[in-house]
């Protein structure tokens, strides 16, 4: 086979910019808050908690960290069964594996790519004590 490279790069996702990002990035550098702390981070956590109507919100470094925290907060422990869609990024399963739980993959629907409810129902027959369903 003879493959021709693409003429232009195909981006998985592009950065969404709304105008003031450089200002906040520069402020983080200038104040030496290039960590998991700082006034900008505290402000966004406060704004998020107000927006969704909860007492607290926490900003995390990535989706994997968010999924891991969700699994921990759901009380998943070693040996627990967790249903995961078979059409997902590895972060979903990594969050389960970090807790030494057992991921069980559920087929997806062809048209929607969502977890197939018929397959999910059958999985509950096989694993009735499942702790969590990871719907991503």
Language-model segments: which ranges?
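Active-site phosphate-binding strand-loop segment of PLP-dependent enzymes
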Residues: 111-136
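N-terminal "arm"/small-domain region of PLP-dependent enzymes with the aminotransferase-like
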Residues: 1-34
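Active-site loop/turn elements of alpha/beta-hydrolase fold enzymes
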Residues: 87, 101, 108-110
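Phosphate-binding glycine-rich loop
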Residues: 37-81, 95-99, 105-107
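Conserved coil-to-alpha-helix start sites within the AMP-binding
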Residues: 88-93
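Alpha-helical elements of Rossmann-like donor-binding domains used by nucleotide-donor carbohydrate transfer enzymes
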Residues: 24, 43, 47, 69, ...
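A short beta-strand submotif of the Rossmann-like class I SAM-dependent methyltransferase core
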Residues: 59, 84, 132-136
